Amino acid sequence: MLRWIRRLFMGLCGLVLAIAIAGVTWQWLATRRDIAATPPPGRLVDVGGYRLHLWCTGDGAPAVILDAGLGGTSTGWGFVQPEVARFTRVCSYDRAGMGYSDHGPSPRTARRIASELAELLARSGIPGPVVLVGESIAGFNVRVFASDHPERAAGLVLVDASHEDDAHDVPGMARFVPLLSTIGLFRLLGVSFGQRVESLAPSVRRYAQATRFRAAGYQAAADELLHIEETVSEVRNTRRTLAIPVLVVTGARGADEHWRRLQQDEASLSERGCLITAQQSGHVIPIDQPKVVVDAIRTVVEIARGQEAAPCATSQQTGQVVR
């Protein structure tokens, strides 16, 4: 009886192992197929043993750098980037592991990401100063960048950005994401981080579809979550007063008074800071109301150029300003 149970157990283990190996192989082959069918729109830049995907359009200075929220990629800026390209150079990029970028070293904290971005810009011939746009968790990245490299930052636009005083509960599932993504379970179930492909700008949907099930993307997003407390500590140790304009864009839908106070606090990082409310938006403003984000970027660009621009100017149709 015990021998039979032992054989059954070993058989089940063998079956599970075989399924896992098949899943890993399928995930790997499918990822290669997707990337080969749809190459990246930008270029891959080596930043020290691994490459980051950088997609630049437009001309002019200062350049604008777009950093997406958790699980997001350069495709999340599909409605914003073409409009910004009308008045200056604008570059969206994929953080290490995300989109078309190679997997990067852990931990994926804001300081490491900011350091990688600085290297990316230097190796791409974009020395700065640049206008940095951070959405959601990427707000931490651009704030650390501006603090660590003040001479390279011309201004910040924080888009419904995370705040260090907000709750940071890490889902227990995050610890299993690397394994589950590697064996292809998320691809099988059709589960992906970031925005639904159909909600993105039509011009970028094919790129999002090609990279949405990459195991490296799930792993990078989980790594950022698992090390969020380290990131928060890094942010708390940054400069509390910045000598550059800081425009904070926040969505009105679903936002409570606590969140609004945190957004106002971020606007107070600079004497030339203000809070702009996107009245028709939830958390994902670059998709819900991209014009509000574009207008905020335009304002910071004009200030950086020395033009007469009111730091908190905005259209009555797109947003409400709180000074």
Give, region by region, the residue ranges found by the protein language model.
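Generic structural signal for small/hydrophobic residues in well-ordered secondary structure
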Residues: V45-V47, L54, I65, V84, ...
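Conserved HGGG/HGGXW glycine-rich cap/lid loop of the alpha/beta-hydrolase fold
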Residues: Y50-Y100
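Conserved hydrolase catalytic core segment
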Residues: P127-V170
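Conserved serine/cysteine hydrolase catalytic core
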Residues: P202-T277
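A catalytic-pocket lid/entrance helix-loop region that shapes and gates access to the active site
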Residues: L158-G194
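Catalytic active-site module of serine/aspartate enzymes centered on a nucleophile-bearing elbow/loop
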Residues: E271-R323
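Active-site loop/oxyanion-hole signature of alpha/beta-hydrolase fold enzymes
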Residues: W55-T57, R95-V133
